[in-house]
């Protein structure tokens, strides 16, 4: 009923829009095409979060400003950890959205992880945020298949001066936010900027320190993690930027900085983790006329001292699995814009590189040493390098029709494959401030670094396992069973005909059953005629059993019973057809996007090692073979044959106790060690789904604004024929995101005095498949509020309350319960 109410309200607002006359104005965006253009002319669906919103909504993590954007899911995993999902499946750890700050990628290249708390993002220094929905591959290249989030900072020419902001807040755990120990959020931020009178030189400095407590986990989770998680996280960043503008046609910007964080992260593979790393970066950007070039480099390092390094809370009970990854990244890009007649043209080149060192002990030999950490194991030192070249043309076919064509070729050196990502948009300008867009695009992507290079032993999902990424194929060219039978090592040592393969020889079964058969047969009628211990352990009897031994084939059960090899990484594609409408109609803004997306050749993690169990049908063969052997050893007479058959039947009965349940596992040829379950990746053929994003905004007055938006997916769970598999296949693919999302709210932002805003976010229930955090996710409605008071243009007080009503929820099952949090901030500008 609530969903119907939200949708009815939304449609009512939307219906009023159609009667409003357009006016000559237009919101400008940069990120859709890497050059300035009106939002209604952009070839992609875009949203802009402006300076007024940023200024009036205090946050200690600017990612929170994205939570009301249509088509974007912002998952708050903990007190200060957020993950961004645009038009794609959601992950706990990774994202398929690229995050930029002034053109520099701040989501990890290749690994595709974004942690705003460990960047130099600052609310004091943000001018606006642009969100581009849908494929960005034709412009931004690899791993931008779902969209781009671009944070754009203030320059010292438009925004000189010194600003400070002090924030303090709390989390509602067991008690209220004001309860003992819950008021544990603090942040101090500084921005100083200046420029000369001629506007040719300027600089700015940003500094920030923050700390926060954490939301508590439930008792069941705490039993697996050894108690509650980190008591307090902290982080800081300092950066300086120089601006040189000797003329209107030349601008050079150089930036350097450092950021660090000690805090929590979550992963579907490894669950809760403590992270401790430091990131140093440098960026140089130049614009000369129509030519733009940028180079950036960064280095993220973990502490040298093992006692200070990150670790995973519940991968093992006896040995801490360390969480470290030293990453070096660099990016170089160049773009040139020109106009030929009625066609605007942009061409560009770029290069992205990242290398990884997870500090695996290459000398490890014992299971304990192998399971001590180093996520990339034998793949440590691997790199991901992508070269790309692209173009985009915008041709005015008539006064009201534009054709935008783009394409990009990327070479993925880590898999030695290349791919072309095309895009075409036909724009119909229904008025100066409205347009209809028809778009067809194909994004190219491949596995991220974690999917490719993972290579280690661990205890993910509570079971001993070994994960191997798809950089290397796991095969079963020489398959054999690793047995879980007690005493199997002694049996193998005593057996001259021990069989290593997909079965077990009769003599091994004989030796394995001896400890229970000797007392059992001694107490039977056989014991009246035969010295059972001496007989069954007689070398002559053993030699006879060996001579008559045969192989009992096992039955493979569970996953991958056909012993198919895992798949290696390759190019995947996402093809999207989209119809979009965007308009700024007087006081109204409206955007409607309807799309169909087809994913091809995508990867998912699966168990690839089957279990082995003995077939019950072999009991008769065992009884006959051993009965004959024992009878002959007892002389071959009638009594000997009867006693021999009784003993043979006894061994068959003992064998039956071993059937019906797995007694071993078949590991891949590339296994670290035998026994733990193998996980590997499989490439699926194709899935298809539809989606829609609808957004409205109404400026009731210059200071009062209302918004409502709705996002819809036709399907979020795929199986069998949906993914190109047979009806008997157990494989599934999950987008891990709800089908329905509704967001609405209002804001009041005057130039002085009181200000505030109220918003709600609704999503329907769904079932997630996220490793540790799999399970049912209930529907939820979350209300947020913020209010403040501007004492003057220099002094402002603000309060931001998340989850105002205090109804706790989890992003996914097993994650922390997110209750109310509040932050009060005092901002002063000199």
For each predicted feature, which ranges?
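Membrane-embedded beta-barrel scaffold of Gram-negative outer-membrane proteins
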Residues: 294-296, 302-304, 471-677
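Gram-negative outer-membrane beta-barrel transporters
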Residues: 165, 396-400, 584-589, 594-599, ...
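Extracytoplasmic beta-strand/coil segments of soluble accessory domains associated
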Residues: 38, 63-105
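Short acidic/polar hinge/loop motifs at secondary-structure boundaries
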Residues: 104-133
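Conserved C-terminal beta-signal and adjacent last beta-strands/turns
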Residues: 6-8, 193-201, 208, 698, ...
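Outer-membrane beta-barrel domain signature, strongest for Gram-negative TonB-dependent receptors
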Residues: 224-345, 349-354
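Periplasmic-side early beta-strands and strand-to-turn transitions of outer-membrane beta-barrels
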Residues: 158-160, 165-275
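N-terminal periplasmic "start-of-domain" segments of outer-membrane beta-barrel proteins
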Residues: 26-57, 80-83
């Amino acid at each position: 009923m609530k969903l119907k109410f939200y949708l009815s309200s939304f449609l009512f607002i939307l219906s009023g829009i159609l009667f409003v006359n357009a006016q000559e104005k237009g919101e400008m965006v940069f990120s859709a095409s890497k050059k300035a253009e009106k939002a209604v002319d952009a070839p992609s669906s875009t949203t802009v979060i402006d300076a007024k919103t940023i200024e009036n909504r205090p946050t200690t993590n600017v990612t929170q400003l994205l939570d009301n954007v249509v088509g974007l899911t912002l998952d708050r995993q903990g007190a200060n950890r957020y993950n961004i999902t645009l038009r794609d499946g959601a992950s706990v750890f990774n994202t398929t959205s690229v995050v930029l700050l002034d053109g520099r990628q701040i989501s990890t290249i290749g690994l595709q992880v974004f942690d705003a708390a460990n960047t130099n993002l600052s609310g004091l220094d943000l001018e606006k945020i642009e969100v581009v929905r849908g494929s960005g591959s034709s412009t931004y290249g690899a791993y931008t298949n779902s969209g781009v989030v671009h944070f754009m900072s203030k320059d010292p020419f438009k925004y000189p001066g010194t600003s400070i902001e002090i924030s303090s807040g709390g989390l509602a755990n067991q008690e209220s936010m004001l309860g003992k120990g819950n008021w544990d959020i603090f942040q101090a931020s500084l921005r100083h900027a200046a420029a000369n009178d001629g506007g040719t030189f300027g600089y700015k400095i940003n500094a920030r320190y923050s700390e926060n407590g954490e939301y508590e986990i439930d008792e069941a989770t705490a039993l697996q993690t050894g108690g509650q998680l980190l008591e307090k996280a902290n982080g800081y960043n300092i950066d300086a930027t120089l601006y040189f503008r000797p003329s209107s046609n030349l601008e050079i910007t150089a930036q350097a900085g450092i950021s660090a964080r000690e805090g929590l992260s979550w992963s579907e593979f490894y669950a809760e983790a403590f992270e401790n790393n430091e990131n140093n970066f440098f960026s140089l950007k130049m614009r000369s006329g129509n030519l733009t070039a940028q180079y950036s480099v960064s280095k993220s390092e973990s502490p040298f001292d093992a006692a200070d390094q990150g670790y995973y809370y519940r991968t093992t009970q006896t040995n801490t699995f360390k969480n470290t990854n030293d990453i070096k990244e660099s990016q170089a890009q160049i773009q040139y814009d020109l106009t030929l007649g009625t066609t605007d043209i942009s061409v560009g080149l770029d290069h992205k590189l990242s290398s990884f060192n997870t500090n695996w002990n290459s000398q490890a030999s014992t299971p304990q040493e192998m399971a001590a950490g180093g996520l990339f194991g034998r793949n440590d030192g691997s790199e991901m390098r992508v070269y790309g070249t692209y173009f985009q043309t915008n041709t005015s076919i008539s006064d009201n029709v534009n054709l935008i064509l783009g394409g990009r070729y990327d070479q993925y050196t880590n898999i030695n494959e290349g791919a072309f990502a095309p895009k075409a948009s036909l724009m119909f300008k229904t008025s100066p401030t409205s347009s209809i867009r028809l778009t067809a695009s194909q994004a190219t992507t491949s596995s991220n670094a974690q999917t490719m290079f993972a290579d280690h032993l661990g205890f993910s999902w509570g079971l001993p396992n070994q994960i191997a990424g798809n950089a290397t194929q796991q095969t079963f060219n020489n398959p054999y069973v690793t047995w879980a039978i007690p005493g199997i090592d002694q049996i193998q040592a005593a057996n001259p005909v021990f069989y290593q393969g997909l079965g077990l020889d009769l003599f091994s079964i004989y030796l394995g059953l001896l400890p229970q058969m000797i007392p059992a047969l001694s107490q039977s009628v056989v014991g009246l005629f035969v010295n059972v211990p001496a007989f069954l352990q007689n070398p002559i009897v053993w030699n006879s059993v060996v001579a008559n031994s045969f192989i009992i084939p096992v039955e493979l059960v569970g996953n991958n019973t056909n012993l198919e090899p895992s798949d290696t990484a390759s190019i995947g594609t996402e093809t999207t057809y989209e119809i979009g409408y965007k308009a700024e109609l007087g006081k109204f803004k409206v955007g409607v996007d309807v799309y169909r997306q087809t994913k091809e050749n995508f990867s998912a993690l699966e168990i690839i090692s089957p279990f082995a169990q003995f077939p019950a049908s072999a009991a008769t063969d065992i009884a006959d073979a051993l009965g004959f052997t024992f009878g002959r050893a007892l002389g071959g007479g009638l009594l000997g044959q009867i006693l021999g058959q009784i003993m043979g039947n006894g061994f068959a009965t003992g064998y039956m106790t071993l059937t019906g349940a797995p007694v071993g596992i078949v590991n891949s040829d590339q296994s670290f060690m035998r026994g733990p379950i193998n996980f590997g990746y499989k490439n699926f053929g194709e899935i298809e789904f539809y989606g829609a994003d609808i957004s409205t905004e109404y400026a009731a007055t210059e200071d009062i604004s209302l918004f409502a938006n709705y996002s819809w997916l036709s399907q979020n769970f795929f199986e069998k024929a949906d993914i190109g598999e047979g009806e008997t296949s157990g494989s599934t693919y999950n987008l891990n995101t709800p089908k329905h999302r509704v967001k609405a709210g209002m804001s009041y932002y005057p130039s002085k005095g009181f200000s505030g805003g109220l918003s709600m976010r609704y999503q329907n229930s769904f079932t997630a498949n996220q490793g540790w955090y799999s399970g049912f996710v209930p529907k939820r409605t979350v209300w947020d509020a913020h209010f403040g008071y501007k004492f003057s243009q220099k002094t402002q007080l603000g309060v931001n309350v998340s989850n105002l009503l205090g109804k706790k929820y989890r992003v996914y099952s097993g994650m922390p319960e997110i209750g109310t949090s509040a932050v009060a901030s005092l901002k002063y500008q000199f």
